[in-house]
Structures are given as C-alpha cells and as structure tokens.
Amino acid sequence: MPQMAPISWLTLFFVFSITLVIFNIKNYFCFSYNSTETSQNLNIKQHKLNWKW
C-alpha cells in the first residue's frame, strides 16, 4: 500500500477544514427566523403583581 507524503496530508486537512468552515458559514447565514409571525401567534398574558405590604 503506498504511503501519502506529509504535504498530501496537509492539503487534505486544509481542504476538509475549509469545507467545514464554508458549510458552517452557509448554515449560519441561511437560517432565517420569522419572529413577527411567531410573536403574533403567541398570546402571552403578562400578569403584573401588585404587592401591598
């Protein structure tokens, strides 16, 4: 079985690292969260507590 030269391992490491970084950046910036739609659907009632000591 032929052995890989160290420069080939380094190139392979950089290719996989750059692929991982690009994939993570793509997932981070492509995720869109519609906060206006969910805030209209949720009817959260706020109960104000009036403490009388």
From Swiss-Prot:
Transmembrane segments: 5-25
GO CC terms in record: mitochondrial membrane; proton-transporting ATP synthase complex
Primary localisation category: mitochondrion
Topology of this chain in the membrane: Single-pass membrane protein
Keywords on record: CF(0), Hydrogen ion transport, Ion transport, Membrane, Mitochondrion, Transmembrane, Transmembrane helix, Transport
InterPro entries linked to this entry: ATP8_metazoa
Compartments where located: Mitochondrion membrane
GO function terms (MF aspect): proton transmembrane transporter activity
Pfam families assigned to the protein according to its UniProt record, in alphabetical order: ATP-synt_8
Superkingdom classification of source: Eukaryota
BP-aspect Gene Ontology terms: proton motive force-driven ATP synthesis
Subunit structure: F-type ATPases have 2 components, CF(1) - the catalytic core - and CF(0) - the membrane proton channel.
The protein's role, per its UniProt record: Mitochondrial membrane ATP synthase (F(1)F(O) ATP synthase or Complex V) produces ATP from ADP in the presence of a proton gradient across the membrane which is generated by electron transport complexes of the respiratory chain. F-type ATPases consist of two structural domains, F(1) - containing the extramembraneous catalytic core and F(0) - containing the membrane proton channel, linked together by a central stalk and a peripheral stalk. During catalysis, ATP synthesis in the catalytic domain of F(1) is coupled via a rotary mechanism of the central stalk subunits to proton translocation.
Family the UniProt entry places it in: Belongs to the ATPase protein 8 family.
The name this protein goes by in its record: ATP synthase protein 8
Species whose genome carries this gene: Aedes aegypti
Gene, per the UniProt record: mt:ATPase8
